[in-house]
Design a protein with these regions (language model features):
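Conserved beta-strand termini and adjacent loop/short-helix elements that scaffold enzyme active sites
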Residues: 68, 103-107, 142
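Short catalytic/ligand-binding loop motif for oxyanion handling, primarily in non-cytosolic enzymes
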Residues: 19-22, 74-78, 110-113, 130-133, ...
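Donor nucleotide-activated moiety binding/catalytic core segment of transferases
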Residues: 98-119
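A short acidic-Thr-Gly-centered motif at the start of a beta-strand
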Residues: 1-5, 113-116
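The start of beta-strands in P-loop NTPase/AAA+ ATPase cores
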Residues: 8-10, 120-121
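Acidic, Mg2+-coordinating phosphoryl-transfer loop and its flanking beta/alpha structural elements
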Residues: 119-158
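Metal-dependent phosphoesterase core characteristic of DEDDh/y 3'-5' exonuclease domains
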Residues: 92-94, 109-112, 127
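Alpha-helical substrate-recognition element adjacent to the catalytic core
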Residues: 3, 9-93, 98
Length: 159
């Protein structure tokens, strides 16, 4: 970890941004029953081979890659741990390399996870309220933007 704040940081949400959690059959009833399988079973929303390659290029150019993902709403401590484990397993299954993983309480301010390390951070998140509350830099709405193309633009700009 760097002593000074990183000037190049990308922060990823997972559910509805990287993973198609909401496309898993009975996802909500399973989460309410404290079943972590929807987090493991969700399909990727992007071509993961290409996304991983682009993120490797970003990391080589000095970008730090963070995962900041909410845990399931109203869950026990044991289930929170199971959800963190399931989300990390999903990332490993799809070969996504990251620098830091933050599985945080549902509704938590995501910027708090990186504020002490981020001078300027880009948030990729499907939740409009989360994006509106992000004050560490720009945001990307993955429901309206091709994230891979946007990340390639960052590389081409040499930022």
């Amino acid at each position: 970890m760097k002593d000074e704040k990183n000037t190049k940081m990308i922060c990823w949400d997972m559910d509805g941004t990287m993973t198609s959690l909401y496309g898993v059959d009975n996802w909500l009833s399973k989460l309410r029953a404290e079943d972590p399988s929807p987090y493991e079973d969700a399909a990727p929303m992007w071509d993961m081979e290409l996304l991983n390659y682009v993120c490797e290029l970003l990391r080589a150019a000095g970008w730090e890659i963070n995962i900041i993902t909410w845990l399931s709403k109203n869950s026990s401590e044991e289930y929170k741990d199971a959800v963190r484990e399931a989300k990390r397993a999903w990332l490993e299954k799809w070969g996504f390399i990251y620098d830091h993983f933050h599985g945080v309480q549902y509704g938590a301010t995501k910027a708090d996870s990186v504020r002490d390390r981020a001078k300027n951070a880009i948030l990729i998140d499907d939740n409009e309220k989360v994006r509106a509350g992000w004050h560490l830099g720009e945001t990307i709405d993955p429901t309206q933007t091709n994230v891979i193309e946007e990340l390639l633009r960052l590389l081409m700009k040499g930022e």
